[in-house]
């Protein structure tokens, strides 16, 4: 599969074969990294991280991934320290940055910004989140985490919990899971149900989808519970946010009827939707999930740069 | 009398037939024909039609529609047929078809879409024709017929 020069913008651009390929390369890199400590596939290559919006995990794990591949990193982590503040267009910023680097990772508050950046740039662009639209590398690392934990994705029953209306992570994860033979429980308050067009699309693609507000009723059936934060910043008005804030909390009480093998995931940051008492249980997979960000992003950087020889 | 002759024959111009009943005003707005210097328009509304039940017809004197303009009509009147008339004769006939991609006609209704903030031509992919559903090339949001009509 030739990935050199390819952009990673939306999970919608990926086939199942593409996804499986990235996961396989990530696994190989993780093994190599464990053996050798550091790699040098990307020696002499420069990654530019353009974060127009704050992030902890995504930016640091991309930077860590590039360093672990032997490359180096330039970039900024807030738009306020750049010429964007002087009114520079996104297109001009991208045309400038591509002169200094070999691959660009961008997070931007506007939907479609990464697609536009990819059209303007002659070097590969990887989307690290565009407004409420897509965050494809998160989806790939989520799939990688599930596959590592269970050895497979097919045959699993997966619950998505929390803000299914505004959460971009759950939208693209659900779309990617539709490639597999899974059952999905969509658990949310009425106000935050998954948009109908996505639910319809999942059903059309053959996924068994159950929508419910009842977390405790769904828990015994699940192999994976994917929890998301109810994001205040995505709500059009405060009143709607207050109505649903704190609707669910995953704690030991809630988990008492869960399968022994249930794994709880979360894209983080969390607020109060998973009680810290869950962290020490065998159910907690969310910090392992954070770790997966590095090999998956190493795979994407290495593939788009064309330095892995695959 | 044939239904499309209910209004006077035009010597030269464009006849847009099979517009859904009641949509003629929207059609002339989209085509920019409501301006005072836009030329003579002949309109028939709520005409019985075998194909549509009821339909509207707009005849535009002295103006030939380009393909890009026809695409604009396709969004509001997907069954429309366009006849170009010269010397009282139909010299060209097109069936309006919704293209796979729509560029530069429609604005994205998502205020946070990058296409509303940067110097970029709006682009949409047609997801379904019946009912009409488009997906913004940039923000990937889907828009339905009502939103399309509001943003034309």
Curated annotation (Swiss-Prot), chain A:
Aminoacyl-tRNA synthetase found in the keyword field: no
The protein's Enzyme Commission number: 2.1.3.2
Catalytic activity: carbamoyl phosphate + L-aspartate = N-carbamoyl-L-aspartate + phosphate + H(+)
Family assignment from sequence similarity: Belongs to the aspartate/ornithine carbamoyltransferase superfamily. ATCase family.
Organism encoding this protein: Thermococcus kodakarensis (strain ATCC BAA-918 / JCM 12380 / KOD1)
Lineage of the species this protein comes from: Archaea, Methanobacteriati, Methanobacteriota, Thermococci, Thermococcales
HAMAP family in alphabetical order: Asp_carb_tr
Function: Catalyzes the condensation of carbamoyl phosphate and aspartate to form carbamoyl aspartate and inorganic phosphate, the committed step in the de novo pyrimidine nucleotide biosynthesis pathway.
Pathway assignment: Pyrimidine metabolism; UMP biosynthesis via de novo pathway; (S)-dihydroorotate from bicarbonate: step 2/3
One Gene Ontology term of the molecular function aspect: aspartate carbamoyltransferase activity
Binding-site residues, carbamoyl phosphate: 57-58, 107, 135, 138, 268-269
Protein name per the record: Aspartate carbamoyltransferase catalytic subunit
UniProtKB/Swiss-Prot annotation, chain B:
SUPFAM superfamilies to which the protein is assigned, alphabetical: Aspartate carbamoyltransferase, Regulatory-chain, C-terminal domain, Aspartate carbamoyltransferase, Regulatory-chain, N-terminal domain
Pfam families assigned to the protein according to its UniProt record, in alphabetical order: PyrI (PF01948), PyrI_C (PF02748)
GO biological process, one term: pyrimidine nucleotide biosynthetic process
Covalent S-S links between cysteines: none
Names of required cofactors: Zn(2+)
InterPro entries: Asp_carbamoyltransf_reg_N (IPR020545), Asp_carbamoylTrfase_reg (IPR002801), Asp_carbamoyltrfase_reg_C (IPR020542), Asp_carbatrfase_reg_C_sf (IPR036792), Asp_carbatrfase_reg_N_sf (IPR036793)
A molecular function GO annotation: metal ion binding
Cofactor comment: Binds 1 zinc ion per subunit.
Cellular component per GO, a single term: aspartate carbamoyltransferase complex
Binding site for Zn(2+): 108, 113, 136, 139
Keywords: Metal-binding, Pyrimidine biosynthesis, Zinc
Keyword match Zinc: yes
Role, per record: Involved in allosteric regulation of aspartate carbamoyltransferase.
HAMAP family hit by this protein: Asp_carb_tr_reg
UniProt family annotation: Belongs to the PyrI family.
Subunit and partners: Contains catalytic and regulatory chains.
Protein name (Swiss-Prot/TrEMBL): Aspartate carbamoyltransferase regulatory chain
